[in-house]
Amino acid sequence: MQDQDKYAEQAASMEEPASADAPAIVPTLEEQLAASQLQVQELQDSFLRAKAENENFRRRAQEDVTRAHKFAIEGFAEALVPVKDSLEMALQVDTPSIASLKEGVEMTLKQLSAAFEKNRLLEIKPQQGDKLDPMKHQAISVVPADQEANTIVSTLQKGYLIADRLLRPALVTVAQEK
C-alpha cells in the first residue's frame, strides 16, 4: 500500500506543474494555429500561382501550334517565289529565241528542283526493270515484255515523296506474267 501512496503522490506532483504550465501551453498552441493558417494561405497562393503559370504555358503552347500550322508552308513558299519571278521575267521578253526560252526554262527548272530539295520533296523515278512497289508506284497498264513479271517497263509520270510520305505515286507500265 505504501507503493500506491507513493505513486499517488508522484502523480499529484506531476499534475500540479502541468496545470501551472497550462496557460503557457495555450499561447503556444495559438501561435502554432496562426503559423499553420499562415502556411495554408502561402500554400494556397503558391498553388494558384502554379495553376496560373500552367494555364499560361498551355495557352502559349497552343498559340505556338496554331502559328506553326498557319506558317507551315512559309519556307516552301519562300523557295518558290524566285521560280515565279523567273517565269514572269521570261514572259516580259519581247522577241525570245527558242534557245533563250530553252535556257530560261532550264534555269527555272533548276530553281524549282532546288526548292523541292530544300523542302524535302523528293522525286520517285523508277527505272526499267525495277520491281513494282505498290507503296510508291501505281501500275497503269500491264504489257507483254521480255523481262520478269511485275517489273517496271516504263515510267509515265514521276511520283513524289514529302519527308518519306507519299505525295503522288509514280505512274508506271508493268510487265505481265508470261
Curated annotation (Swiss-Prot):
PANTHER family: GRPE PROTEIN (PTHR21237), GRPE PROTEIN HOMOLOG, MITOCHONDRIAL (PTHR21237:SF23). Participates actively in the response to hyperosmotic and heat shock by preventing the aggregation of stress-denatured proteins, in association with DnaK and GrpE. It is the nucleotide exchange factor for DnaK and may function as a thermosensor. Unfolded proteins bind initially to DnaJ; upon interaction with the DnaJ-bound protein, DnaK hydrolyzes its bound ATP, resulting in the formation of a stable complex. GrpE releases ADP from DnaK; ATP binding to DnaK triggers the release of the substrate protein, thus completing the reaction cycle. GO terms for cellular component: cytosol. The keyword Acetylation does not apply. This is Protein GrpE. It is found in: Cytoplasm. It comes from the Bacteria. GO terms for molecular function: adenyl-nucleotide exchange factor activity; protein homodimerization activity; protein-folding chaperone binding; unfolded protein binding. Keywords: Chaperone, Cytoplasm, Stress response. It holds the Pfam family GrpE. It comes from Herminiimonas arsenicoxydans. The keyword Ubl conjugation does not apply.
